[in-house]
Regions:
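Conserved phosphate-handling catalytic cores of large alpha/beta enzymes
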Residues: 42, 47, 57-58
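Short, conserved phosphate-binding/catalytic loop or strand-edge motifs used
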Residues: 27, 45-50, 128
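DNA strand-break repair and replication-stress modules
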Residues: 4, 11, 53-292
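Cys/His-rich short segments
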Residues: 1-19
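Conserved ATP-binding/catalytic motifs of P-loop helicase motor domains
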Residues: 17-25, 32-41
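Conserved strand-to-helix beginnings and helix N-cap segments that scaffold or border functional pockets
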Residues: 5, 24, 44, 289-290
Length: 292
């Protein structure tokens, strides 16, 4: 229950789904009395559920107010909480990803994932190496995201959230700049295969047409491609593990599908201010500093 309470508390927090009025004590009681099994159950709560939860909590704690004993039950707090839960259904992709409580995914990483991939339907099915295509996301964070999304239970929670009315209003096409690293060489480097450096990955990508060809290749073919014997043997041993070979093939397939979804780039010709910071100086005589 403690883990569930923390997950729901994070999910409802101001920078996540922003459910005003859902404090930790309410969450604890909702979990204790079985109203919540996971965060998606928030969107099934009714006014009667909240009132019953509070009544049971007060009886449990021996703290039934005199007004309640007299038959007067306050409901405005519950009305407000139901309204806050309903408002939270409309959210952004970055908030939703942050709210899920994925290990190592704070606000900035959630925003980066949203900005670069743009769509929950895409993100939730990507193999972990492709998350490394986002600037500042390294192997540890990418693996954590992949591990979370590989759990069937987490995917079911996402499904239930969407089924219960959560709407992500800012979906968009993936960033066309992703195309700069959607190739076999980058993928092989991102997979963190022992002894396969970016240089070796580029050699392999030049020698093999695609991931399927590499999976089927014997070690001597990798040596022919330019790899030292120890690197070739390490790669061959890595590929002998079916989980590794499957990850490579799934990642390559997802990479190709992602590349096909990229919009055309509109910034192929960089403008004169591309990548530069501009500072405007001078005065605005008619305005104060705050107005300017």
């Amino acid at each position: 229950p403690a883990q569930l309470v923390q997950a729901v508390f994070h999910f409802a927090s101001r920078r996540a789904m922003d459910i005003d009025g859902l404090g930790e004590r309410y969450i604890e009681s909702l979990a204790d009395f079985g109203y919540l099994q996971d965060v998606s159950d928030l969107y099934r709560l009714t006014l009667d559920d909240l009132l019953e939860m509070k009544r049971r909590a007060e009886e449990r704690d021996g703290a039934v107010p005199e007004t309640v004993k007299a038959g007067k039950v306050a409901t405005k707090w519950a009305d407000n909480l139901i309204a806050a839960i309903d408002r939270s259904r409309d959210t952004t992709l970055a908030r939703f990803l942050y709210a899920l409580g994925i290990e190592h995914v704070g606000e900035s990483t959630a925003k980066a994932l949203a900005q670069w991939f743009g769509d929950l339907a895409l993100i939730r099915h990507l193999p972990w190496p492709l998350f490394k295509r986002v600037p500042d996301i390294g192997g540890e964070v990418a693996r954590a995201i992949g591990h979370f999304l590989d759990q069937a239970g987490n995917q079911q929670v996402i499904d239930r959230l969407l089924e219960r009315g959560v709407r992500i209003g800012d979906a968009h096409a993936p960033n066309p700049k992703l195309g700069d690293g959607l190739d076999l060489a980058a993928l092989l480097a991102d997979l963190e295969i022992p002894r396969v450096t970016p240089v070796r990955a580029a050699q392999l990508a030049s020698a093999f047409a695609d991931a399927e060809a590499l999976v089927d290749a014997p070690a001597h073919a990798m040596v022919t491609a330019g790899l030292p014997t120890d690197s070739a043997n390490a790669l061959a041993a890595w590929l002998e593990d079916e989980a590794n070979a499957g990850l490579l093939l799934r990642s390559a397939q997802a990479m190709n599908a992602l590349r096909d979804r990229l919009p055309e780039r509109s910034d192929d010709v960089a403008g004169p201010l591309e990548g530069k910071t501009v500072v405007l100086t001078g005065t605005l005589a008619a305005m104060g500093r705050d107005e300017a």
